[in-house]
Swiss-Prot record:
Presence of keyword DNA repair: no
Intracellular or extracellular location(s): Cell membrane
Protein name in UniProt: Uncharacterized protein AF_0098
Bilayer-spanning residue ranges: 9-28, 33-50, 55-72, 77-99
Membrane topology listed for this record: Multi-pass membrane protein
Main location: membrane
Domain of life: Archaea
Keywords: Cell membrane, Membrane, Transmembrane, Transmembrane helix
Gene Ontology CC entries for this record: plasma membrane
Keyword check for Transmembrane: yes
Organism of derivation: Archaeoglobus fulgidus (strain ATCC 49558 / DSM 4304 / JCM 9628 / NBRC 100126 / VC-16)
Length: 107
């Protein structure tokens, strides 16, 4: 039962980040708003265990977050959104890697 609550929480975080990305897109029409939405979508896919390569998504999202963090001179709210939005993705990929060590990855 605890695992189900955790999964619902990760899905909630993902939807929340997508909503914030859409609001950011409405307020400031910028390419970085799309990255926030993509972070939320990737986290949603990973937390729902949709069968796409979560490791590849995690690498792409981490690269996008890193590139954005380099371009931002001070701590901007978008970097915080990227970090929070990437949490479900990191947790899902971590559980995938933990399962693959035991021979149970992505089943």
């Amino acid at each position: 039962m605890d695992k189900m609550k955790g999964k619902k929480f990760l899905v909630f975080i993902s939807f929340f980040i997508i909503l914030l990305g859409i609001l950011d897109l409405i307020m400031e029409f910028d390419h970085r708003s799309y990255i926030i939405i993509l972070v939320g979508l990737a986290s949603l896919f990973a937390s729902l265990n949709i069968s796409i390569s979560r490791l590849a998504i995690a690498v792409c999202i981490a690269a996008a977050v890193f590139i954005e963090a380099i371009h931002v001179s001070n701590l901007h709210y978008r970097v915080i959104l990227y970090a929070i939005g990437s949490l479900p993705l990191i947790i899902s990929v971590g559980s995938y890697l933990k399962g693959s060590e035991k021979g149970r990855g992505m089943r």
